[in-house]
Amino acid sequence: MARVDNIGLAFQTYYVYIMTNKGNSVLYTGVTSELENRCTQHRTKNYPDSFTAKYNINKLVYYERFANINDAITREKQIKAGSRKKKIDLIEKENSNWLDLFEIKVGTDWL
């Protein structure tokens, strides 16, 4: 969904995100324009045969915002190409306790 800035121009926000399971043993990186909806899909196993459903990926531990979809896709690919250690370092720099950011942010003006 496009948002409107303070002078009435529509703009879109894109997100690169990392989710994990309860034990933080499996990491999933994705890109979306609707982070709250996408997290809900993962959490409710909307696609039961998907990777995220199979490995119970339901905890949002990291996300970045982008104004340009191409920048978001480039960043997603960069994160996916990195090692597990690099992903963990990225998460721990912003969210050292691996809190579920969805639980903290849902319903707020975080998007």
Model-derived regions: residue spans:
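GIY-YIG nuclease catalytic motif and its immediate N-terminal context
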Residues: 1-47, 53-63, 74-77, 94-111
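Short, surface-exposed polybasic/aromatic micro-patch for ligand or macromolecular engagement
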Residues: 66
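C2H2-type zinc-finger recognition helix
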Residues: 69
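Short arginine-rich
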Residues: 77-91
